[in-house]
Each structure stands twice: as structure tokens, then as C-alpha cells.
Amino acid sequence: LQEALSAPKEVLPREKDLTDGEALLRKALELGAEEVLLLGALGGRLDHTLVHLELAFLLAQKGVRVELTDGLTRAFPLLPGLHAFPLEPKTPFSLLPFPEATLGVEGARWDLPPTALKATSRTLENEALGPIRVRVEAGRALLYLF
């Protein structure tokens, strides 16, 4: 965090055609970022949160690792592949198909074999037993830690 606080800053006009978050993500791509931590991207205005989530998926498609946070909760866009997260035991999490995905999870209180999911609450409120592994076989998903 100290490194982020000492980073160069740009002042953006209040009235513009994109959110501050989108401007930040464009700049990150321009600078060749491999990882992005988007602070203040969750909570607050729902319209901004939804746009930031979509933009996070776009960056992930370009190979950038993205984490969104409001300081209390964290979210990670997941594309097809195997994703490992070093969670502490009892860490609560949800996996959301975004909008649909075939995915499985291991290392959770309720493991899930690869399952096609769409518009469901089945993958809400799980609990890590320790590190978890999420395999997205198709579609997109969001890992939400709370």
C-alpha cells in the first residue's frame, strides 16, 4: 500500500466520459501492468461497481491479474483455467457465474464438481478449509471474498 501511495498521481476532470476506475485501468494497460489492484471498486454506486467488474474481465482477458476491493471485501475475475487462492481456513467466499460458467471448487466446506451454472445462488456463502482451487471450464466467474 505504501508503494501505491507514493505512485505518480493524475488529477482527472470531474466531468468526463468514463469513470475514474476506467481511466485507471486504461492507464494500467498503457503502462504494461501485469497486476492491478482497484481500490474503491466495490460498494458505493452499483452502476460503477458493475462497470468495474466488466472492465476487470476485459483486463483479465488481456492477461492482467486483477483484484477489486472496497477495503473489506475482495473480488477476482476468473476466466477458463485453474485458479489457486491461498485462503486461510474459515475464509467466507462466494463464486458467481458471470453470467454463466461451468466451474468446480476444491478445498471448500462445500466442494463442487465441475457444474454448469447460470443465475443461481448455489455457489453463494461457502467457506475455505485452507487454500482453494477453482477450475473454470467455460464462461466467466467471479470469486468474492467477504
Which functions belong to the PLM regions below?
Residues 28, 47-89:
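Conserved phosphate- and dinucleotide-binding cores of soluble alpha/beta proteins
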